[in-house]
């Protein structure tokens, strides 16, 4: 397993090599796609990318938590969280890549 993290610049470079756009056009394309995903999530909409997965918004209700060090009860406010659910295709691809190692 690699310690390398895929970055926005890596994505832009890959688009540059695979598609043949200029480096600037590739960076702009990646930025545009990520902005569209972010904007839709911020607007409360889920995002589904076929064969990759879905970004879903879930509302969590408020509850009472406990500080593990002191044992004091602490209220935790209701909040909206972002959840990623990988597609079956992605799960199988990751599983097959791990079994090859």
Swiss-Prot record:
Pfam families: Bac_DNA_binding (PF00216)
HAMAP family cross-referenced by the UniProt entry: IHF_alpha (MF_00380)
Organism encoding this protein: Maricaulis maris (strain MCS10)
Phylogenetic classification of the source organism: Bacteria, Pseudomonadati, Pseudomonadota, Alphaproteobacteria, Maricaulales
Cysteine disulfide links: none
A single GO BP: regulation of DNA-templated transcription
GO molecular function, one term: structural constituent of chromatin
UniProt keyword list: DNA recombination, DNA-binding, Transcription, Transcription regulation, Translation regulation
One GO term describing the cellular component: cytosol
Gene, per the UniProt record: ihfA
UniProt protein name: Integration host factor subunit alpha
